From Swiss-Prot:
Function: Produces ATP from ADP in the presence of a proton gradient across the membrane. The V-type alpha chain is a catalytic subunit.
Organism: Anaeromyxobacter dehalogenans (strain 2CP-C)
Name of the featured protein: V-type ATP synthase alpha chain
InterPro entries xrefs: ATP-synt_VA_C, ATP-synth_a_Xtn, ATP_synth_asu-like_sf, ATPase_F1/V1/A1_a/bsu_N, ATPase_F1/V1/A1_a/bsu_N_sf, ATPase_F1/V1/A1_a/bsu_nucl-bd, ATPase_F1/V1_b/a_C, P-loop_NTPase
Known catalytic reactions: ATP + H2O + 4 H(+)(in) = ADP + phosphate + 5 H(+)(out)
PANTHER family on file: H(+)-TRANSPORTING TWO-SECTOR ATPASE (PTHR43607:SF1), V-TYPE PROTON ATPASE CATALYTIC SUBUNIT A (PTHR43607)
Length: 579
């Protein structure tokens, strides 16, 4: 089916003669065959958002409908690849066309020439259905790639073709003539089905103490990371990609500055994967749509990332989907809505912003797959509120749709406190659900310690306001101890060094032992002050400095170091009380 262009407004164009087209159908626009998607139909007129620069298009140029929705190619070769928002392979296109892509440039997302060794797990006569593993695809220098039956496909195996196969070549033939290849296509806006959702009672461990202990999120949960410029959103997401409990990382750079994304593309291949010792990029899929790339493709990029994440989830893997940032996605939505002349909502964003965000975050979850395995997609969405204003619409809509807020503070970032998570603003809705896991796996009493630590930090904030008025020296020793204990907790527990091999990540058991010792120091020092020991004498023991160095020890050495420090504390306090 084909039509003709009758109206153009930036990336939004209108074509006549497409009466039989459907919503979200992919079209090719103009003589250069620019990629687009139908977003509105009125009679035989279709409104199309074009995923490329539209300058130079002329009225009357042809528009060709494909009959299919916008879809991604899923199969071996995804890991380690870099795509744009509509899954064009940027590395291959750059090699062919240079650093700047021409309009209409296109290549298949997966290499059609590369051969993979297919080792089947099924035999003729077996009945297969969606989610069943057909076998494994292997290639030199690439991780093993499970091949599963796509959702909605079922039948009895008639023939298996093992050995070297390209992604489009049939690997399994079903009775009735249907074929299954290593490659499948899936519409990006349609969530992939699962057998059932599992309860959110297992944490998504990040390796960051402030997140795992104070504001945990479940595997398959959602978190939003708002923060102004320079607060460390990108650095935090890179640390999560490296250290979080995820088998696969899908990183979506949505509308960020080109310089920032080029830095990410330069650093990721050089980051070492702590699991394998190889490059972190080997278990990462990157989707890049910078601020100077077409705005419509930016809107599609997060759906492309979600479809790829769900594909790996269906293999029984834990997937972390990082989006940097949803604010740029919402700005693209606002621009498209304005060109459609829709009624604007708050700050010009479309009135359906909240429902679109909620629908997207609902694609996260820990599930039992169609094949009976357990997989999860955990979403972490960065937000870039103008001026750090958390009351703006994108942040507020994200808060209503997600389970945790990891708010970043510019003040903490300027003080070189990493991660710059503001513990007075951040929260989680999943702490109670995950409390049982932490009590079992980290240590009995973990929840009580966390509550005690947060009360200590809140008390410090109250006393700090008083100290600004009257001076620290005017406070009683017990109040000054609160300030000192909270400082030790902030600098020794909540702050982590991404450059220290032992402190870059922290397992829950190590965090529990550290937190217990910090709070024990505070309680016992408070008891000594109550018995008449001056605070200065306690501080002169140097035990506080030893507390600050606990995080730099490997996890296996922390219990012994904590026991030694606890014994030295008992001896010092006993001596001072006797004096």
């Amino acid at each position: 089916m084909s039509g003709t262009l009758v109206r153009m407004a930036g990336p939004t164009v209108v074509a006549e003669g497409l009466a039989g087209a459907s919503l979200n159908e992919v079209v090719r626009v103009g003589e250069e065959r620019l990629l687009g998607e139908i977003i509105r139909i009125e009679g035989d007129r279709a409104t199309i958002q074009v995923y490329e620069e539209t300058a130079g298009l002329a009225l009357g140029e042809p528009v060709e409908a494909s009959g299919e929705p916008l879809a991604v190619e899923l199969g071996p070769g995804l890991l380690g690849s870099v795509f744009d928002g509509v899954q064009r392979p940027l590395s291959e296109l750059a090699a062919r066309e240079g650093d700047f892509l021409g309009r209409g440039a296109s290549l298949p997302a997966l290499d059609r020439a590369r051969a993979w060794e297919f080792e089947p797990a099924v035999a003729p006569g077996d009945r297969v259905e969606g989610g069943v593993r057909l076998g494994v695809a292997r290639a030199p220098g690439a991780p093993d790639h499970p091949v599963v039956v796509p959702p909605g496909v079922a039948g009895r195996v008639a023939e298996v073709r093992a050995g070297a196969r390209r992604v489009e070549e049939p690997a399994v033939l079903l009775e009735g003539g249907a074929t299954l290849a290593l490659l499948e296509r899936w519409p990006v806006r349609r969530p992939r089905p699962a057998r059932r959702r599992l309860p959110p009672d297992v944490p998504f461990l990040t390796g960051q103490r402030v997140l795992d202990c104070f504001f945990p999120v479940s595997a398959g949960g959602t978190a939003v990371v708002p923060g102004g410029f320079g607060t460390g959103k990108t650095v935090l997401e890179q640390s999560l990609a490296k250290w979080a409990a995820a088998d696969v990382v899908v990183y979506v750079g949505c509308g960020e500055r080109g310089n920032e994304m080029s830095e990410v593309l330069d650093e990721f291949p050089r980051l070492e994967d702590p699991r394998t010792g190889g490059p972190l990029l080997a278990r990462t899929v990157m989707i890049v749509n910078t601020s100077n790339m077409p705005v419509a493709a930016r809107e599609a990029s997060i759906y492309t990332g979600a479809a790829i994440a769900e594909y790996f989830r269906d293999m029984g893997r834990s997937v972390a989907l990082m989006i940097d940032s949803t604010s740029r996605w919402a700005e693209a939505l606002r621009e498209i809505s304005a060109r459609l002349e829709e009624m604007p909502g708050e700050e010009g964003y479309p009135t359906y912003l909240a429902s679109r965000l909620a629908r997207f975050y609902e694609r996260a979850g820990r599930v039992e797959t169609l094949g009976g395995a357990e997989g999860a997609v955990t979403m972490v969405g960065a937000v870039s509120p103008p001026g750090g204003d958390l009351s703006e619409p994108v942040t507020q809509c994200s808060l209503r749709a997600t389970g945790a807020l990891w708010a970043l503070s510019a003040d903490l970032a300027h003080r070189r406190h990493y991660p710059a998570v503001d513990w007075s603003v951040s929260f989680t809705l999943e702490g109670d659900r995950l409390a049982g896991w932490f009590e079992r796996e980290a240590g009995d009493g973990f929840g009580a310690l966390r509550d005690e630590a947060r009360k200590l930090l809140q008390r410090e904030r109250e006393l700090a306001e008083v100290a600004e008025l009257v001076g620290t020296e005017s406070l009683q020793d017990a109040e000054r101890l609160v300030l000192e204990s909270a400082r030790l907790l902030r600098e020794g527990f909540l702050r982590q060094s991404a450059l220290d091999p032992a402190d870059a990540t922290c397992p829950p058991a190590k965090a529990f032992e550290m937190l217990r010792l910090f709070l024990e120091w505070h309680r016992r020092a408070g008891a000594a002050i109550g018995a008449g020991v001056p605070l200065r004498s306690i501080l002169d023991t140097g035990l506080g400095a030893r507390l600050l160095r606990l995080g730099q020890l490997p996890a296996a050495e922390v219990p012994a170091a904590a026991a030694a420090l606890r014994a030295d504390l008992s001896e010092a306090l006993a001596r001072m009380e006797a004096e």
